[in-house]
Structures are given as structure tokens and as C-alpha cells.
Amino acid sequence: KNILSKFDIPKINVIRNENDLYYRNKIELKIVDGKLGFYEKNTHNLIEIKECKVTKKSINKSFEFVKNMKLENANVTIRANYNDEVLIIIDSKEKPVILNPEDYKIVGIVLNDKCIYGQDNFMEKINNLFFTVSYNSFFQVNNYINLELFNLIKENIVGKTVLDLYSGVGTLSIVASKVVDKVYSIEVIPNAVKNALINAKINKCDNINFILGKVED
């Protein structure tokens, strides 16, 4: 039954993802008793995985590296950028073994919010724009849809003042700043705001006011 049929809602065109496989630039995993995987829905039963078909191949390749860290129990987040460089973020009481990270293009490892190898950020690129992304900063997980979103923004907000709420590293703020007079960008995570200020400078944007704080305030 279509419960929305009584409402006069215009047709919405859904933008299809160009690639159905190997497109996500981030994954969050569990390590339980030395095994890497996801929790089964509504349980704490671990489903061990060897591959995740919706995340980038560079992330899948790094699974081997993560398993070789010899961790028994941990939360692990893996992020990869346009150049297939990889950041690994670990929450664990154990110290990981680090073996041949260069073979997997690992540029940084963060353990309990402390960088223990390489750097705690990397550079992301979409179209002709560059973005510094810290290990705990929000960045959209689908770069293809990001590009489509950028184009949609440019087409619909020319000449206006824009509020970018929960703005992360300033991705949408920077895109909007190219076609509007002023952007107010609000984000609660300090690292993300720090990234956003750098990103505005990299992309030569001087009409964005970055605000550190809660949107609700």
C-alpha cells in the first residue's frame, strides 16, 4: 500500500550510483578473538569476513594487514582516499604489530586517538577540489555521488547566502562558496573545523565563516 499517495509529492529523480561495487571509502569492523568481521544484526555474534564488496579494493587489501596486527579484541575503522592511500583507526587496549605498511599503502595508524605510525590524515580529491581529512573527521563515503551532489548544489543555489550544518571538513561549504556570496559552516568536531580551514585555503575560498560548535546551540 502506498501511504504517500494522498500527498501531492513531485516525482523525485534518484541518482544511481555509477558503481554498485567497491565504491565506499570507509568501513567499520570488529575484531573478536582475533577474527575480523561484522556483528550479526541485533547480536554480538561476529561474522568473519574476507572481503566486503561495497568498499574500495584498497580497503579490502588492507584486511590482511589488519589481521597481521595480532589484535584479539578491537574496533577498527579503515578509510581510503582517491589515491588508494589508507588510514587505519583502532580502538583497543592492545598494541598492534605493524608489519610492512608500505605494501598496503598505509599512510597512518591511529590507536585510541593517538597517531602511532605515519600521519593522522590524508588528502581527498573530488573533481578539481582537494580536501584534507583527519582520521575522525566526517567525509561522505561515496565519491561518485559526492560529485553529483556538487553539481546539484551549483545548479540550485547561485547568488544566495548558505548555511552548511554539520559541515564536516567543509566539503559542501567549499563547493557552495564558488557560486554564492557567503557561507556559514557549523561543525562540532575541532579536527574537522581545523581541516575545513585548511581546505578553504587550499581551494582559495575566502567567503566562508567557519564556526566551531553545536548546530542546536
Model-derived regions: residue spans:
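Extended interfacial segments that mediate partner engagement and assembly in macromolecular machines
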Residues: 1-72
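Short small-residue beta-strand/loop micro-motif enriched in glycine and branched aliphatics
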Residues: 44-50, 85-88, 133
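Flexible glycine-/small-residue-rich
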Residues: 31, 40, 90-92, 135
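Nucleotide donor/acceptor-binding cores
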Residues: 25, 86, 159-160
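A short catalytic or substrate-binding loop motif that flags glycine-/basic-rich loops and adjacent residues
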Residues: 19-23, 81, 116, 131
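N-terminal auxiliary segments of SAM/dcSAM-dependent transferases
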Residues: 62-118
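Rossmann-like S-adenosyl-L-methionine
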Residues: 93-217
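Generic beta-strand structural signal
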Residues: 31-33, 80, 125-126
